[in-house]
Regions:
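Glycine-rich phosphate-binding loops at beta-strand->alpha-helix junctions
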Residues: 11, 53-62, 181, 200-217
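N-terminal glycine/serine-rich phosphate-binding loop of ATP-dependent small-molecule kinases
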Residues: 1-83
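Short loop/helix-cap segments at secondary-structure boundaries that form the rim of catalytic
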Residues: 65-69, 84-86, 212-219
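Active-site rim beta-loop-alpha module in soluble metabolic enzymes
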Residues: 142-198
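Active-site regions of enzymes building and remodeling cell-envelope glycoconjugates
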Residues: 68-74, 91-93, 218-226
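Gly/Thr-rich phosphate-binding beta-strand-loop-beta motif of the actin/hexokinase/Hsp70
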Residues: 1-23, 107, 111-136, 152, ...
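Active-site neighborhood for divalent-cation/phosphate handling
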Residues: 76-118, 124-127, 171-172
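Glycine-rich phosphate-binding/hydrolytic loop that grips phosphoryl groups
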Residues: 221-245
Length: 245
């Protein structure tokens, strides 16, 4: 059984998948906050081969390692010049966040041969571009939806903290809705700009805030759950599957 782990800045997402299973055909899937991580020990016990993407630092890596089955074959996923049909065009390939690299691999596996814009919407929002020939050419990083909303509350005297999960009208007639409309537009703009800049690109949106941000997009797109885990699965197996946005 293969265990795939996506350790992000706020949560750790994971999936178990049988050898030979189709791309993204999980046997089990879950998530936990960093504080709750110990609860996954029993779930992870069946993972004999493990692939981990970790962007949350060495302390969390040590906690993850301590929870894995003794004797498990563990690979700490890293950005490399090439993997799973994707060529890493970052100026220094090793400096590309491993989660972004995995997400691009996942998108490429789902939509082979297509130009791609891959948006992952979590604590931060990343918007990355992959050419049809499989070259990752770079991207954008911006504060995530909730972080944008909370920064206004922290740094202005009279603006309230708002829930970034509520869908507002375009023109808010109260301060909360005006903030939410503003931050949604600020999230959608870079994605739409990337699609326009790449030209006729397939757009894949993933992450916890993806359903809210997708509602504001004016370009064709598809929301794909757990694109980093899909990418880890593709990186480990070479599997592809086709989807259309």
């Amino acid at each position: 059984m293969m265990l795939l782990i996506d350790a992000g800045n706020s949560r750790v997402k994971w999936a178990l998948v049988e050898d030979g299973a189709a791309l993204g055909a999980w046997s089990a899937i879950g998530a936990a906050s960093h504080a709750e991580l110990d609860i996954v020990r029993a779930d992870w016990a069946s993972g004999t081969r493990v692939l981990v993407s970790n962007v949350a630092g060495p302390a969390l890596a040590a906690r993850i390692a301590a929870l894995l089955q003794a004797g498990a074959q563990v690979e700490w996923f890293a950005s490399t010049p090439q993997r799973a049909g994707l060529t890493n065009g970052y100026r220094d390939p090793a400096r590309l966040g491993c989660d972004r690299f995995a997400a691009a691999i996942g998108a490429r596996a789902l939509a082979p041969g297509q130009a791609l814009v891959v948006a992952t919407c979590g604590t931060a929002t990343t918007v990355d571009a992959v050419c049809a020939d499989g070259r990752f050419i770079g991207g954008m990083i911006l504060p995530g939806l909730a972080l944008m909303a909370s920064s206004l509350a922290r740094n202005t005297a009279q603006l309230p903290q708002v829930d970034a999960g509520t869908l507002p009208p375009l023109f808010g007639d109260n301060t909360n809705d005006a903030i939410l409309s503003g931050v949604l537009s600020a999230q959608a703009g870079p994605i739409e700009r990337a699609v326009a800049g790449l030209g006729a690109a397939t757009c894949i949106v993933s992450g916890g805030a993806a359903p809210y941000i997708a509602s504001a997009l004016k370009v064709p797109h598809q929301v794909v759950d757990n694109i980093v885990l899909v990418g880890l699965h593709a990186a480990a197996t070479g599997l592809t599957g086709e989807t259309r946005c």
